[in-house]
Each structure stands twice: as C-alpha cells, then as structure tokens.
Amino acid sequence: MTIQKTGCRGREAAEVVEQRRRSHHCDDRKQTLLALLILVLYLGMGISGSSWEVSGQTKDCNHFQNPVTPQGFEYQTKEPAEEPLRTLRKWLKINLHGFLEKLEKEVRELEQLVRDLEFWLDALLGDLRPEDPCFT
C-alpha cells in the first residue's frame, strides 16, 4: 500500500517536472547563450589586445616558404578598431539589461527545477523508513 501511495505521488511530481520542462523556451535560451558566447569571445579579443589580422608570413612554422611568393598578401590592422568598439558599447547599453533579466529568469527556473526535484525525491523516498518490512 505504501509503495502504491509513494508511486502515485512520485508520478505526480514527475508530471509537474515534465510540464515545466516542456513549457520552457529552449530556442530562446539557445539564442541567448549563443549571443553571450559571441559577446564574450569578442570582448576577450579586445581585452587581450588581439586584433583582426591575417598574415601571409609563416615564420613560426616548419613549412617550406617559397621566396618568390609576393609579400603583398599581408593584411594587418595596426590602428585600433574604434568603430566596432563604439557599436559594441552601444549594443551593450541597449541589451545588457535584457540579458540580465533573462539570466535571472533562467536562474529562477533552475532553482524551481531543483525544488521540484527535491519534492519529487521526498515524495518518492519519504515514506521509506527503517521499520518498514522492506528493510528487514
């Protein structure tokens, strides 16, 4: 009888968890995480001092270099890229608050999922006590 009672509560808890998981907007989360990843990578390049440069010279590798190859294939930007930084700052001012709200919402949803999981585990394992016949 106890097993059926626990099974019913466990099933109800599992249904609640499954409903929350289905109602979650997975695409929105993926887009947010992708945008954050791109933002972190872009800011990381700016902070580390790396610039967008492509060089035709391969001095540090062990490949054979043809001396006839023209050296005009070098493209390097030595000047700071102010326009992309200005654009990024403007975009951050506009969208950072929205990202923060989405992240806070994600944290609240994860906390709720943890509470649901704790409830489900309590419902599933809560009635089992050492004096039950299963433990003898």
Swiss-Prot record:
It holds the Pfam family DUF4635. Disulfide bonds: none annotated. The chain crosses the membrane at residues 32-52. The keyword Coiled coil applies. It is a single-pass membrane protein. It is found in: Membrane. Residues 92-124 form a coiled coil. Keywords: Coiled coil, Membrane, Signal-anchor, Transmembrane, Transmembrane helix. Residues 53-136 are extracellular. Its main location: membrane. Residues 1-31 are cytoplasmic. One of its GO terms (cellular component) is membrane. This is Small integral membrane protein 23. The lineage of its organism: Eukaryota, Metazoa, Chordata, Craniata, Vertebrata.
